[in-house]
């Protein structure tokens, strides 16, 4: 009997903590899936070459501490969490921080170099979307044991689920994979990715998720690494890559509408980051930037992950005027602007 009383008190305490943790926030939880745009450190302890838990990554983050974020500071989803009223960030699910009541504000399952296409993650030792979904199921079981089935159902249905993927599928797979190039046009490959996307949303829906936001592809042809690898010596944005991004994003928006019509109660928003990001690149001074082609880290042409390190020659002293932190990822300053766009476009996920 005494054991039952202690157990019952612990459940009551955790339920109270659940409501306390989300009291200042407008939604009970934030749950993230996808790639390096939203990864906050899940790759840190993997046998993967794609990591960022070392300086100069994180040099402008809290306590100048590298966490595994592919940025000099905060990601767009970090700013989004702040805007939504969270006092801390949902932890990386594979980190030590993802313990006890910390996961009651959500969790982050994203893994750098993953994509809609599971094979994209294999060469890099990253966590595929399929595996991220299995971790999410384990997360749901843990939360349900902690706060009870009814409260857990509220958390999953009212919490916002964010998905960011697709860039790695194109830049780190399709464009450099001769077999995929031979078998599929960019349009056909986009259809393959969107079938995986639809299946992923279907699975989330069956697991109780009702508020989901998916981040579009950025102007891929304007990433410094893309210009270096695919620009044929030209220093301008690679037009064909940007055209592929536009094509994919159009299909993504159409697919989200079809999925919403098919699933009762589903709120699904396709966040358009392409145009806001392109506006920053094409009108830098209007947004407080002066460098759009060269990234801050190293030579600014290709460095990312282990190539962007404390010994990288040429790393800028102050990244606030740079659009790109490394060859693939924006600076904290850009992430803050993009987070405002996400918030504005995602009102339907909040109300």
From Swiss-Prot:
Its EC number is 3.1.1.-. Glycans are attached at residues 234, 254, 318. The keyword Hydrolase applies. It holds the Pfam family Lipase_GDSL. Residues 1-24 form the signal peptide. It is found in: Secreted. GO terms for molecular function: hydrolase activity, acting on ester bonds. GO terms for cellular component: extracellular region. One of its GO terms (biological process) is lipid catabolic process. The active site is at residues 36, 326, 329. Belongs to the 'GDSL' lipolytic enzyme family. This is GDSL esterase/lipase At3g53100. It comes from Arabidopsis thaliana.
């Amino acid at each position: 009997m005494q054991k039952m009383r202690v157990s019952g008190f612990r459940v009551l305490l955790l339920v109270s903590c659940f409501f306390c943790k989300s009291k200042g926030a407008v939604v009970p939880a934030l749950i993230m899936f996808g790639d390096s745009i939203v990864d906050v450190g899940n790759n840190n302890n993997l046998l993967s070459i794609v990591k960022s838990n070392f300086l100069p990554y994180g040099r402008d983050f809290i306590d100048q501490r590298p966490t595994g974020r592919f940025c000099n500071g905060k990601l767009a989803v970090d700013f989004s969490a702040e805007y939504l009223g969270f006092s801390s960030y949902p932890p990386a699910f594979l980190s030590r921080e993802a313990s006890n009541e910390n996961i009651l504000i959500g969790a982050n399952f994203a893994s750098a170099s993953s994509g809609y296409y599971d094979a994209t993650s294999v060469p890099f030792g990253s966590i595929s979307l399929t595996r991220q979904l299995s971790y999410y199921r384990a997360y749901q079981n843990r939360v349900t044991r902690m706060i009870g089935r009814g409260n857990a159902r509220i958390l999953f249905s009212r919490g916002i689920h964010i998905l960011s993927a697709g860039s790695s599928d194109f830049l780190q797979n399709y464009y450099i994979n001769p077999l995929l190039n031979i078998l599929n046009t960019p349009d056909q490959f986009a259809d393959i990715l969107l079938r995986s996307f639809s299946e992923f949303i279907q699975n989330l829906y069956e697991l109780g998720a009702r508020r989901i936001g998916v981040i579009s592809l950025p102007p891929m042809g304007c990433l410094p690494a893309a210009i270096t690898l695919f620009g044929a010596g030209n220093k301008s944005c690679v037009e064909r890559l940007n055209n592929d991004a536009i094509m994919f994003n159009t299909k993504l928006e159409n697919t989200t509408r079809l999925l919403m019509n098919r699933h009762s109660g589903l709120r699904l928003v396709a966040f358009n980051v392409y145009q806001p990001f392109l506006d920053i690149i094409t009108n830098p001074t209007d947004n407080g930037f002066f460098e759009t082609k060269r990234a801050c880290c190293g030579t600014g042409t290709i460095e990312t992950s282990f190539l962007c390190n404390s010994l990288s020659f040429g790393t800028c002293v102050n990244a606030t005027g740079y659009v790109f932190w490394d060859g693939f990822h924006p600076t904290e300053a850009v992430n803050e602007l993009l987070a405002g766009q996400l918030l504005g476009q995602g009102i339907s996920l909040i109300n």
